Amino acid sequence: MLNKANKVFLMSCLAVLLLSDGSFAQKEEKQPNVTPVFEVQDLFESVRIPNIVVTTDGTVLAFAKSGRLLRRSEDGSKSWGPIQEVGSDSGGSAIVDDNNGDVMIVNSKGGYLWRSHDQGKTWKREEIVIKPNAVGHGTPDGIPVQTTCSESGVTLRYGKYKGRLLMPARIQPPKGNNDQEWWPYNHNTAIYSDDGGRTWQTSGPVQSGTGEGTLAELSNGNIYYNSRCHMAVDHRRRIAWSYDGGHMWTDWEVSEHLYEVGQPFYFKYGTKPSYGCNAGLVRLPLEATGGKDVLLFSTPDNPGSKRVRMTVWASFDGAKTWPVKRLVYEGLSAYSSLAAGQDGKVYLLFERGKKKLYESVAVARFNLEWLVKGQN
């Protein structure tokens, strides 16, 4: 809980973000975005694995069932079109190519993707090439790399690798085996493409025991990787950084501020670490923050215990600290995904339930003003 002085300081920071340059202030006079906004509605029933993105024209695409089901909103989540199927085998995570507006559901384990040229209205299946990393991880017919259950990917915007497509991914040897004895060998990685998604390179690893990752690029070109850990005795998230466009991951660390959550899992080895939970991560567009790096993170807020209390955290210093958080949903909640529009509106797609955990996938729409004013 922040004291009154710190709350005043954070509100001052928000004012700076909203009015830090003339062009943004002028834009806000025409289309105010300082009134707190918060709305929640259910989009899917009895399915799991949410993923959400905002396309280059502002269309919001909410995916469920690992990218197989889709609902579209062309008015900023106020209304939604009917459920449509991307493809019966379209399992994977989403990415928007900011270079040309294409949207893709990448199934790197299967060696293909589904692509849309029209903001998610229609889709076409394409074969892709997955190249392994230096130790041979990432081949569909060997030890595959998969994006399923990871956060959506990003188009890099800064520096030498501007325009590269980068997606969080994971390695599950052998051949995707999720048996308990193999968990120490599981680890997150990434895949990246410099040719619009036709060819993907598997990157180096992050910490062992990780899975279901999230990543975000800062305005200096550094890439922040935040991972679920299936063996977190300390109940904390795992962090890594890339300074070469996502090719290698260094500066591994344990988060001081973000806890791993999820019911303790019984291990035959005698320990009971948290089993962890998938999470969401997004960096707000610089156009909406006056050029400041503002990151948001989402996961249930119940360290080391059952999945409840879907919460969003905010960082204003490039993921060094996370001083603000706000509860979105009190009840049962689990996997989540975050996206943001150019106007600063944030979209949180998450699993929730009243009596059972996975009753629905809901979308919450809010802005930074709502998050900061009501921080808890």
Name each model-derived stretch.
Residues 26-376:
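Asp-box/BNR beta-propeller blade signature and adjacent active/binding-site loops
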Residues 10-20:
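Bacterial N-terminal signal peptides
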Residues 1-10:
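Bacterial N-terminal signal peptides that target proteins for export
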Residues 22-24:
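Sec/Tat signal peptide C-region and signal peptidase I cleavage site
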Residues 5, 18-19, 191:
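Disordered, low-complexity tails and leader-like regions
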